[in-house]
């Protein structure tokens, strides 16, 4: 799907590919990377589904804008609601999958690159979806205005805007119906405008959710960096503790050596005293005895 997206991101995403974890004899680290890449492949498949769902929503929007049969239009709206629900489910799933992939790759630059590619592609698809909704919203408003002008051709721009913005349009349209010359056509126009109004309410809700999702995915980068900073700080603290521990150990070794030297000196002094006693006391006594 191609849109004039001012926020389109140029980062290419990796094509998904399956890796057979069981057949790889590459050790624990290799198996970990294989498991991670299988997770990325699943994310890319879900991104493909999300892209397809957006295309379906866009196609149904265009068909609804040109459909004149009310029964067929009702069927199309039901299909549209189903695809919008599918898109919402995929958005929630992809957000969690990409967040998990970023956590798994926090220590590995290759994993980080793969997770970031998925995040960038998701952001682009969110923007594409916002453009689809925005275009449909504008077309809906224009059609609602044209329908209102059928029964109130002399209405001002403000009056038209108030009519299509009114919840249900009952109060304004009741007066318009009283003044209309062609009641049947006016009632048809009222039903059409009310249907458009409900579409506009859904679109506003969808666009608000997409904006919040886009902001959440942008903030994942900040959150990821904060996690890296915390880990780096913990590593630095651990290194400092090790260095301090080594310093304390060196001091202990020096103290032990000094204690041993003092102990040796004490024994030497004791030995010297014993020698002196022997020479001064014992030797003369032995000489006298002889």
From Swiss-Prot:
Topological domain spans for side Cytoplasmic: 1-265
Q: Where in the cell is it found?
A: Membrane
Keyword Glycosyltransferase listed: no
Q: What does the UniProt keyword field contain?
A: Coiled coil, Membrane, Transmembrane, Transmembrane helix
One GO term in the molecular function aspect is: SNARE binding
Q: What is its main location?
A: membrane
Tell me, which GO biological process terms does this entry list? Answer: ascospore formation; ascospore-type prospore assembly; exocytosis; Golgi to plasma membrane transport; Golgi vesicle fusion to target membrane; intracellular protein transport; SNARE complex assembly; sporulation
Q: Specify the protein's topology with respect to the membrane.
A: Single-pass type IV membrane protein
Residues on the Extracellular side? 288-290
Xref: SUPFAM superfamilies: t-snare proteins
- Give one Pfam family, short name only: SNARE
In terms of Gene3D superfamilies, this protein maps to: 1.20.58.70
Q: Which GO terms describe its cellular component?
A: cell periphery; endomembrane system; fungal-type vacuole membrane; Golgi membrane; plasma membrane; prospore membrane; SNARE complex
* The keyword Transmembrane appears for this protein: yes
Residue ranges of domain t-SNARE coiled-coil homology in the record: 190-252
Membrane-spanning segments: 266-287
Q: Report the family membership.
A: Belongs to the syntaxin family.
Extra info from the record?
Answer: Present with 450 molecules/cell in log phase SD medium.
Reported function: Required for vesicle fusion with the plasma membrane.
Q: Which protein, by its recorded name, is this?
A: Protein SSO1
Q: Which organism is it from?
A: Saccharomyces cerevisiae (strain ATCC 204508 / S288c)
What is this organism's lineage? Eukaryota, Fungi, Dikarya, Ascomycota, Saccharomycotina
- Tell me the name of the encoding gene: SSO1
